[in-house]
C-alpha cells in the first residue's frame, strides 16, 4: 500500500503538518476554493522564484500565507516592492487582509518540488531525460539525502508509445511512517506533448520526542 498512496498524505498528522491550517463548518467550500485561487495565483506570479510549499492559516478576516522559497530575494524584490505588490493583489483577490511570511529553503536539493521542477525545465530545453535524472540524483545525494527515486513518463525521446523510466539511489522506505519522505510531481511541456516527472526524497527518520515520566519509568 505504501507504494500506491501519496507519501505526504499518508504521513499528515504523524510526522507531517497540514499545509492549510484552518477549521470551518458552513464556510468550508468557500475557504477551500479561496485557498486554491491563492495557490494558483502565487504559482503563476512566482513561477521563476523557486516556491515550494505554500502554507495558509486563517483568522477572522485575516489570511496568513507562508511561502517556502529558495530565492527569497526574488520574492521580496528591491525594497520589498515585489512582496508589497503581491500582498495588494492577494488582498484584492480574497477581499481580506493578507499577511505574507517568506521562509528560505536552505537546501533546495533536498526539496522534492524544486528537484522535480529542475528536471522538468531541463526536459523542456531538450536535455536527455536520463541525464537530467542522473544529475538530479547526484546533487541530492551530495546534499545529504539518504535516498532518492525519480521517474519520467510520457513520449520519451518522441517515441510513439508512452512509457515510464526511472532511477533510484540509496533507500526510500515508503512503508515506514516515521521516514521523512518528500514527494512531488511536475509536468514538462515538450514538442511531443507533456511529460510527467515524479520525485521521492528520503531525508532520514523523524523520531517522536520522548515524554518525561515521574519516577524514571
Curated annotation (Swiss-Prot):
HAMAP family: Ribosomal_uS3_B
Record keywords, A-Z: Ribonucleoprotein, Ribosomal protein, RNA-binding, rRNA-binding
Domain (KH type-2) ranges: 38-106
Gene designation: rpsC
The keyword Transmembrane is assigned to this record: no
GO biological process, one term: translation
One Pfam assignment: KH_2
One Gene Ontology MF term: structural constituent of ribosome
Organism name: Streptococcus pyogenes serotype M1
InterPro entries named in the record: KH_dom, KH_dom-like_a/b, KH_dom_type_2, KH_sf_prok-type, Ribosomal_S3_C_sf, Ribosomal_uS3_bac-typ, Ribosomal_uS3_C, Ribosomal_uS3_CS
PROSITE patterns: KH_TYPE_2, RIBOSOMAL_S3
The UniProt record lists the keyword Ligase: no
Name of this chain's protein: Small ribosomal subunit protein uS3
UniProt cross-references to CDD domains, sorted A to Z: KH-II_30S_S3
Function as written in the Swiss-Prot or TrEMBL entry: Binds the lower part of the 30S subunit head. Binds mRNA in the 70S ribosome, positioning it for translation.
Family of the protein in this entry: Belongs to the universal ribosomal protein uS3 family.
Membrane-spanning parts: none
GO CC terms of this entry: cytosolic small ribosomal subunit
Subunit details: Part of the 30S ribosomal subunit. Forms a tight complex with proteins S10 and S14.
